[in-house]
Design a protein with these regions (language model features):
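Accessory RNA-recognition modules of RNA-modification enzymes
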Residues: 1-293
């Protein structure tokens, strides 16, 4: 299929980290991998009547704000903000918050400040990896991967700089274990790993086929994790949906303390991915409650 390429000038940043520009015929373009004041060539990934979406293929005139992403091959799959300095990211996010209030005719009394604990990388406590198998060689490879933004393709990775290091370490251990047992990517759906604030991890391996002893109790005990599960997930659904819990090893319940209260939660459950920042938001909200129940 022939690629649809457009050249345009980018004007601003919108929510989520896309840059916004206008095509020659007047249609708006929401672009991944671009910055304001850049002229770029984009590959159109979605073409609607009033707008297009696309991914930067070539930067013709680069912004002074552009930096080399920490994860150059996969950053668009995890955090499109990596192509700018942390201070620039904070500036744009503050401006987007202010703009959101202005759309509702609300003028904030004070300048917006974005709170940070200074951790740019290694802070996320949950990552969901896909799987990728290269069948071009004599032996099929097995890699953890992310979906490529704007396509159905996948990007093999060694982890992500945003995740707690223990998550990346565990993901590679599980990959190597499955590879040593000749497990093929087509039989696997996803690998979900979550850790608490001490770095203790729980994993869930979602599979699409019946794989007896894909991970044995002894193998699970040798992984750098407090526990894990093997889960059959309906292959008709792309989501990591729990159809049947096949095996469970160790302790699969994570535990964290926030403002003196202990929370226990499952690997697959919804919980904040950056607990120190979430805890600060709780402090801020508590200040406005005036000791009310």
């Amino acid at each position: 299929m022939k690629q649809h390429i457009e050249t345009l000038h980018l004007e601003t940043i919108v929510g989520g980290g896309q840059a916004l520009g206008t095509l020659e015929k007047g249609k708006k373009a929401f672009v991944w991998g671009g910055l304001p004041d850049e002229t770029v060539k984009i590959r159109v990934t979605k073409n609607k009547s009033r707008y297009v979406e696309g991914v930067v293929e070539e930067v013709i005139d680069s912004s002074k704000q552009r930096i080399t992403p920490k994860d150059p091959d996969s950053y668009l799959s995890t955090s499109p903000w990596q192509l700018m300095a942390f201070e620039t990211e904070q500036h744009y996010k503050a401006a987007l918050i202010e703009e959101a209030f202005e759309l509702h005719n609300i003028v904030l009394p004070d300048t917006i400040e974005i709170y940070t604990n200074g951790l740019e990388y290694g802070y996320r406590n949950k990552v969901e990896f896909s799987w990728y198998g290269d069948t071009s060689g004599s032996v099929e490879t097995l890699d953890i991967a992310f979906f490529r933004r704007g396509s159905k393709g996948k990007i093999p990775v060694q982890g992500t700089s945003l995740a707690h290091p223990r998550i990346n370490e565990l993901a590679l251990k599980i990959r190597d274990l499955l590879s040593s047992k000749n497990v093929e990517a087509r039989s696997l759906k996803t690998l979900l790993i979550r850790c608490d604030q001490t770095g203790s991890c729980v994993w869930q391996l979602y599979i699409k086929e019946n794989l007896p002893d894909v991970i044995t109790p002894d193998e699970a005990a040798n992984l750098p994790a407090q526990g894990g599960e093997v889960i059959y997930s309906d292959p008709k659904s792309p989501a990591s949906r729990i159809t049947d819990r096949l095996d469970s090893f160790g302790d699969v319940v994570l535990k964290d303390e926030l403002r003196g209260t202990t929370f226990r939660y499952a690997c697959e459950g919804f919980f904040q991915v950056n607990l120190p920042i979430y805890e600060q938001s709780l402090r801020d909200m508590a200040e406005g409650l005036d000791d009310k129940p």
